Amino acid sequence: MRSWTLLLLPLLLTACPKTAAVATAGAVAAPGAEVLTVSTTPDGLTEQKVDLDRDGKPEITNYFRERTDAPRLLLRKDTDLNRDGRIDVRAEFDDGGQRVKEQLDGDFDGRADWVDHYIAGKRTVSEVDTDFNGTFDLFKYYESGVVRRKERDSDGDGRIDAWEYLNEAGAVVKTGKDVDGDGKMDVREQ
């Protein structure tokens, strides 16, 4: 991820809550922001475009499901971090308000370079395109919020050829390699 992307993350963190339930409390998450438009999408969701810097262009687009028996429910939040008009971060939520997926375009080319998957609001898998070539080549698997296994396609052939197993503290405890290109671990080291 480019270093200046990290400078824009405070915008994302103030604008994207951990769960959709937090976002339903108010129409705008950031002080001073302005709701530009509210409309209905073809699939019946309420689309809300939010301008954080009051330049007349939306940096955030929220997609809500309106409910009669409960407050509106945030299903998706799209964020334009670098203000180029393209989505840089997309967060998706389930009907319980829990995050289910988040995608980040770290090099601002219009393609997701990092995708996190969540179950019951906890991250379970991350897919990462480490060289920004459009193909995910690193996969991280989480247990209780901690990376416990990493799988990597280091030669770009579409098959996993390196594995790392980590303990609860994040230290590597075992590694493996595929040396013959069949996608199966041939060499194990502890």
Where are each of the predicted segments found?
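Calcium-binding acidic motifs and repeat modules
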Residues: 16-190
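Bacterial N-terminal signal peptides
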Residues: 5-14
